[in-house]
């Protein structure tokens, strides 16, 4: 069988997800990521290599959020790097599908990447606001960062001998309100808040702080509610 050429049309047909449930990815990121995929499939780089690069770019973007006084537009560069890391998040899957190297290791690495980047940009977002005089921001950032580590989910799955819990934090009752914390939604809200504040106030402002309050308080309370709910479900 003749090997298909990695043309844009072939890549779009074979590399796109059959069902893309994330509108931002479907209508904005995927149309961009396919061009990066077109370049990368011509190199020896694997999907896992791209995922590692995604982690590095995401961490650099997160750190930029924490140093608003280092240089004026640091948080702006931060959100741009975070958006680029999400492009790479789409690219790694497209490369894996084209090169037929989809694996559990790749999926696992991708999920670990999300956890690392989300927790870091939440903490750095809070630290950056704290550096600009929002005294409670550091505590909120720590709370939001800590809640991104689903320690309770690991413990629950282990004692209940299941791999995937049906009462995931985003799928049960009022906990659905926390969907805005999911990746990439939380990153996009953060990006919009930072861009708005820099446009209106020339730096971190009240919009970013209000968003951090939502991340730090609502998500923390939701996580506590989920832990209690799971505790009483166990025999």
Please state what every model-predicted region is:
Residues 68-69, 130-131, 196-197:
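Short helix-capping/hinge motifs at transmembrane helix termini and TM-loop junctions
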Residues 38-39, 59-66, 189-196:
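Alpha-helical transmembrane segments of multipass membrane proteins
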Residues 47-105, 140-142, 204-215:
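Membrane-embedded alpha-helical segments that form the functional core of polytopic membrane enzymes
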Residues 33-43:
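Cytosolic juxtamembrane amphipathic/interface segments immediately preceding
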Residues 42-60, 79, 98-152:
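Multi-pass membrane catalytic core of lipid/isoprenoid biosynthesis enzymes
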């Amino acid at each position: 069988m003749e090997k298909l050429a990695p043309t844009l049309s072939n890549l779009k047909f074979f590399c796109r997800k059959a069902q893309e449930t994330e509108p931002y990815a479907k209508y904005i990121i995927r149309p961009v990521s396919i061009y990066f995929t077109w370049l990368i499939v011509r190199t020896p780089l694997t999907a896992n290599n791209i995922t590692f690069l995604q982690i590095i770019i995401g961490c650099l973007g997160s750190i930029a959020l924490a140093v608003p006084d280092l240089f004026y537009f640091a948080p702006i560069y931060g959100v741009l790097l975070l958006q680029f890391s999400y492009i790479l998040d789409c690219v790694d899957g497209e490369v894996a599908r084209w090169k037929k190297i989809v694996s559990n290791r790749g999926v696992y690495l991708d999920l670990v990447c999300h956890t690392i980047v989300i927790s870091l940009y939440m903490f750095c977002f809070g630290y950056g606001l704290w550096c600009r005089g929002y005294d409670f921001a550091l505590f909120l950032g720590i709370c939001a960062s800590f809640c991104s580590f689903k320690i309770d989910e690991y413990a629950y799955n282990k004692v209940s001998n299941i791999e995937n819990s049906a009462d995931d934090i985003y799928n049960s009752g009022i906990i659905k309100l926390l969907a805005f914390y999911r990746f990439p939604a939380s990153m996009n809200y953060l990006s919009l808040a930072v861009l708005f504040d820099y446009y209106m106030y020339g730096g971190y402002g009240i919009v970013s702080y209000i968003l951090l309050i939502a991340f730090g308080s609502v998500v923390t309370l939701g996580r506590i509610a989920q832990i209690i709910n799971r505790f009483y479900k166990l025999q």
